[in-house]
């Protein structure tokens, strides 16, 4: 029997090269080998202020990107998180066994809430519990994540352990965390110490998957390097050029040493890197535009995926509710 893989991307903003190399491209490979559930995390999206029209648009656009990148709805289950109400139901059950102290240690809440944490919503604080519900509800064997989500996955494992000990049986599967290799952590084009992010105020900090060719050339040309005039790889001393080299090697699948030897300076290196990015993204962008012209098809995929996901999700929730003593 195939192992189950679960992952998702928050449905806000425009997906970028970091999302593609860190998550989506790997999902496309995994769909051949695993029983995959890939979702649009729209419940997570409302933990910050977002206009209703933007949320709806983001869900549809993200789905179109998933499909354009190569995810096959006949091979994987793709759905919007909010369409499977059991996610929220399980999150509440898990909230009731998760110690407050565990959530206070979550570093992402501190980062996202900023200095005035008193004004942050409860949903943002309990975000990791909903994330745990997203994973545990499908009894996932493997959860591929970036390094920045490792703390949340450890919390998920801890929560599963609490439930299993409470009822003295393995109700929830403790998942294996899969931290990706090359290309999983693409950094900002403006600051090599920060991860590429759709929430960054500067659009030139990232390559959006829908950027046209001219804009990609502009962004790579203006990407920060340093005062040195040669190409070399050193994550600590030269984070910006090292990040560009990571992108180059991941997309071209060439050896790092060969790439470094081919370039004396930044100009030709950046020009070639932009072309490599365009070669990889243009077919996806063309397919995306085609899919966006068929909204009826996209909605059909979401509803079919949700219906399929709900079968698995309801089994887990009902099993746990029975253990708690609810009448079902």
From Swiss-Prot:
Compartment list: Cytoplasm
InterPro entries in the record: aa-tRNA-synth_Ic (IPR002305), Rossmann-like_a/b/a_fold (IPR014729), Trp-tRNA-ligase (IPR002306), Trp-tRNA-ligase_bac-type (IPR024109), Trp-tRNA_synthetase (IPR050203)
Keyword Magnesium found: no
Binding-site list for L-tryptophan: 134
Binding residues annotated for ATP, in chain numbering: 10-12, 18-19, 146-148, 186, 195-199
GO cellular component, one term: cytoplasm
Gene3D superfamilies for this protein: HUPs (3.40.50.620), Tyrosyl-Transfer RNA Synthetase (1.10.240.10)
Motif ('KMSKS' region): 195-199
Keywords for this protein: Aminoacyl-tRNA synthetase, ATP-binding, Cytoplasm, Ligase, Nucleotide-binding, Protein biosynthesis
Main subcellular localisation: cytoplasm
Alphabetical list of Pfam families matching this protein: tRNA-synt_1b
Complexes and interactors: Homodimer.
Cross-referenced HAMAP family: Trp_tRNA_synth_B
Function description: Catalyzes the attachment of tryptophan to tRNA(Trp).
PANTHER family from the UniProt entry: TRYPTOPHAN--TRNA LIGASE, MITOCHONDRIAL (PTHR43766:SF1)
Similarity comment: Belongs to the class-I aminoacyl-tRNA synthetase family.
Name of the protein in its database record: Tryptophan--tRNA ligase
């Amino acid at each position: 029997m195939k192992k189950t893989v679960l992952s998702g991307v928050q449905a806000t903003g425009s997906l970028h090269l970091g999302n593609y190399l860190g998550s989506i491209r790997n999902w496309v490979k995994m769909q051949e080998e695993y029983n995959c559930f890939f979702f649009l995390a729209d419940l997570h999206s409302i933990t910050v202020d977002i206009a209703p029209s933007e949320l709806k648009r983001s869900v549809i656009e993200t789905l179109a990107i998933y499909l354009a990148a190569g995810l096959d709805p006949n091979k994987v289950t793709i759905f919007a998180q909010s369409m499977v109400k059991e996610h929220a139901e399980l999150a509440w059950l898990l909230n009731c066994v998760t110690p407050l102290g565990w959530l206070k240690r979550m570093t992402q809440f501190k980062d996202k809430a900023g200095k005035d944490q008193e004004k942050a919503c409860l949903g943002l604080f309990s975000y990791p519990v909903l994330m745990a519900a997203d994973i545990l509800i499908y009894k996932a064997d493997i959860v591929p994540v970036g390094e920045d989500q490792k703390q949340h996955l450890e919390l998920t494992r801890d929560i599963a352990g609490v439930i299993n000990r409470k009822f003295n049986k393995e109700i929830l599967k403790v998942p294996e965390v899969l931290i990706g290799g090359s290309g999983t952590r693409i950094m900002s084009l403006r600051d090599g110490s920060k991860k590429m992010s759709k929430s960054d105020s500067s659009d030139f900090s990232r390559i959006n998957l829908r950027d046209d060719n001219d804009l990609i050339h502009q962004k790579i040309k203006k990407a920060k390097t340093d005062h040195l005039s040669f190409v070399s790889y050193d994550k600590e001393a030269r984070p910006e050029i090292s990040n560009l080299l990571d992108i180059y090697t991941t997309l071209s699948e060439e050896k790092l040493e060969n790439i470094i030897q081919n370039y004396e300076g930044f100009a030709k290196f950046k020009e070639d890197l932009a072309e490599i990015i365009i070669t990889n993204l243009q077919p996806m962008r063309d397919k995306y535009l085609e899919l966006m012209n068929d909204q009826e098809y996209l909605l059909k995929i979401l509803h079919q995926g949700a219906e399929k996901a709900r079968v698995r999700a309801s089994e887990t929730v009902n099993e746990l509710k029975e253990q708690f003593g609810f009448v079902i």
